[in-house]
A protein has these predicted regions:
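Partner-binding and oligomerization surfaces adjacent to conserved cores of proteins
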Residues: 2-353
Length: 353
C-alpha cells in the first residue's frame, strides 16, 4: 500500500514537472494561463458557507435580483493591492539581472518595463472581484458599516445537487455577467437545455495569499519559466509578446496577493478580467464612484436556481438589531424565501456606542 501511495505521489510530481516543461516549450497565453490556474489558484470547495458582507440595501438587492456585484479592484480597501505584487516581481527581476546571460536580458528588461508601466498607470483598471470571508462575524468587517450596522450573507457556492436524465448529479455554481446573459445566452434558452457559460464569466472561489514568501515563490516560478523559454529558443514571436502572455495570467493572479495586515479577513475571491466586452455599471459609495459588473448566480447550465444557496444570515452589531432582524424575516417571507427565516441570527459581538 505504501509503495502504491509513493508511486502515485511520484506520478503526480512527474505530471506537474511535465506540465511546467510543456509550458516552457510553448509559452503562449493559453499554456501559461492553464499552468497558473491549475498550480497556483487555491480552489475552495471545503469552506461552507462563504460570507459576503454588505449593508441592508445591498442585502435586499442581492436577494431580489439573485446577483452579486463584482467591484473594480482599483477601488477596494487595500490601496497597495496588485502594486505590491508588481514591485515584488521587479525585485526578483533585478536579482536575475545580476547573474543572467545577455540572451535573457531583453526579456527581463521588457518584463521590468511593463511592470513599471502598470505601476505608473494603475495596474488594476480591468480587474473585478467579489469578496467573501471565511468568518461571518468579524469585528473588523462590522466596523466598516458604523452605527448603521451591516449584514453578512453565508453562501454555499461550491457544489449543489441537481438531476440529469432522471439521476442525481453534482453541479457547480456559475457567476454569469448579466449583460452577457441578456444579450447572448437568453436567446438560446428555448433552443438548448445545456447553456455553457463563456470561460471568462465562469469562475471558482480563490483564496487570497497573504504570505510574502509564497507570493515571491509564485512570481519567481513564472519569471523563471520565461527565462527558460528564452534560453531554449522557444519564444513564439518576441520577448515583449512573451511578457504580455505572462502578464495576462498575472491579471488574475495579482488580485489574490494582499498585504499580511489584512490576513484576519481570510478573504476568498471570485476574479474577472474585463476584456472590453462587459457592460460596466457605476454606483456611489463614500463619495466615490465605483465601477462594477452585475453577476447573476446561476447553475452550470446558466439556468435559474430553484433554491438560492444561502445558508446563514448574520445581522451585525447595531442599536436596533432586533428591529432589523424582524424586518429581514418579514422581507424574506414576502419574497419567497420562507425557508431562510430560521437562518437569520444576530452577531455574537456586542454593540457599543
Amino acid at each position: 500500500m505504501e509503495k502504491e501511495k509513493e508511486s502515485s505521489g511520484q506520478a503526480r510530481k512527474n505530471l506537474m514537472e511535465f506540465d511546467r516543461d510543456l509550458v516552457i516549450s510553448c509559452p503562449c497565453t493559453q499554456s501559461l494561463f492553464t499552468y497558473v490556474m491549475t498550480k497556483y489558484f487555491t480552489i475552495v470547495n471545503d469552506i461552507k458557507p462563504q460570507y459576503h458582507y454588505t449593508d441592508i440595501n445591498g442585502f435586499m438587492s442581492i436577494m431580489k435580483n439573485k446577483e452579486l456585484w463584482a467591484t473594480n479592484t482599483r477601488f477596494l480597501n487595500d490601496e497597495t493591492e496588485c502594486l505590491e505584487g508588481l514591485l515584488l516581481a521587479q525585485e526578483i527581476i533585478r536579482e536575475y539581472l545580476e547573474t543572467c546571460i545577455d540572451k535573457e536580458k531583453a526579456f527581463l528588461y521588457s518584463f521590468y518595463k511593463v511592470a513599471q508601466d502598470r505601476i505608473d498607470k494603475g495596474s488594476k483598471q480591468n480587474v473585478y472581484s467579489i469578496s467573501f470571508c471565511e468568518d461571518g462575524d468579524l469585528l473588523s468587517q462590522w466596523r466598516g458599516y458604523g452605527k448603521r450596522g451591516g449584514i453578512s450573507i453565508g453562501f454555499d457556492l461550491t457544489y449543489y445537487e441537481t438531476e440529469h436524465q432522471g439521476e442525481k448529479a453534482i453541479g457547480i455554481f456559475n457567476f454569469m455577467d448579466r449583460y452577457h446573459y441578456e444579450t447572448v445566452i437568453a436567446e438560446k434558452r428555448e433552443a438548448d437545455d445545456f447553456l455553457p457559460a463563456d470561460g471568462e464569466f465562469w469562475a471558482k472561489l480563490r483564496k487570497v495569499i497573504y504570505d510574502k514568501d509564497e507570493q515571491r515563490k509564485i512570481l519567481d516560478d513564472l519569471i523563471d519559466i520565461g527565462i527558460e523559454a528564452v534560453r531554449q529558443g522557444n519564444i513564439v514571436r518576441n520577448e515583449e509578446n512573451l511578457v504580455n502572455d505572462i502578464m495576462y495570467s498575472l491579471d488574475y493572479l495579482l488580485p489574490t496577493f494582499k498585504n499580511k495586515g489584512f490576513e484576519e479577513e481570510k478573504e476568498i475571491r471570485y476574479i474577472w478580467r474585463d476584456d472590453g466586452s462587459r457592460k460596466i455599471y457605476f454606483r456611489e459609495r463614500s463619495e466615490l464612484i465605483l465601477p462594477y459588473i452585475r453577476c447573476m448566480i446561476r447553475d452550470c447550465n446558466c439556468q435559474e436556481l430553484k433554491i438560492f444557496p444561502v445558508k446563514d444570515i448574520i445581522v451585525g452589531p447595531q442599536a436596533r438589531q432586533k428591529e432589523v432582524i424582524d424586518g429581514i424575516k418579514y422581507f424574506l417571507q414576502c419574497n419567497g424565501y420562507e425557508y431562510l427565516i430560521d437562518k437569520v441570527r444576530p452577531s455574537e459581538i456586542p454593540y457599543r456606542e
